[in-house]
Amino acid sequence: MQNKISRRQFLQVTGASAAALLLAGLPVEASAASGHLTVTPDTLVSDLRADPTFAASGVWTWQSAVDSPDTPEAGTTLSDYVGANMAQDSADALNYLADTYEAGTQVTYKVYSPEEIAADATRDGVELYYWPSEVPGSKFVVVMSGNVLNNTANMSEGYATAWRLHQMGYAAFVLRYRVFLKAKDNAPVADLGNAVRFITTHAGQFNVQPENY
């Protein structure tokens, strides 16, 4: 049975900051059960981005989403990058995405159609990252992390929150939305609305409830 989540629990899960709506020197470790890098809080961000599975999956591995993504200094670990309090949940979330992708399930989805992107190139980076529920016909949650200004905080608030919600039985989606110079005319709000439309339109594919989400 799928657990219900109270407002208080949601704020605890998200750290109240999925707002706007939701050591070095260690060897690179490959998972024994899969071909991808096993992400831990001590994994170097550079190793994560160099991993073929993560690169092929299309998963966004940045925090800021301004015109030029932030580039951590050499030797920056996941814990350094997202914060120690979110590092383990972020690592677990990333490993699950990689496992899901390697098992043959798409985990990255464009929110806008090719025609919509052709009409407005800023829509091209608007994406959903998908943690399937293990409960058929589950409810879904769209996590919109960051400050809706210049930082989507996907790698910290977004993925950590999605992982906790996934563990509660929900299908979780993290939205990468437009920020900074691309966020004109209430673009983040439009991105959220279109993300929900995309999920409900493809509810059968995602095996989620198209209503009461």
List PLM regions with ranges:
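Short amphipathic alpha-helix adjacent to the substrate-entry channel of hydrolases
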Residues: 156-173
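Cap/lid segment of the alpha/beta-hydrolase catalytic domain
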Residues: 146-157, 174-187
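Short beta-strand element of the alpha/beta-hydrolase
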Residues: 138-146
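Short acidic-hydrophobic catalytic motif
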Residues: 37-77
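N-terminal secretory signal peptides and thylakoid transit peptides that target proteins
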Residues: 2-18
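N-terminal cap/lid segment of alpha/beta-hydrolase-fold proteins
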Residues: 78-135
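Gly/Ser-rich "nucleophile elbow"/oxyanion-hole loop immediately N-terminal to the catalytic nucleophile
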Residues: 198-213
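C-terminal segment of N-terminal export signals and the immediately downstream linker at the start
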Residues: 3, 24-47
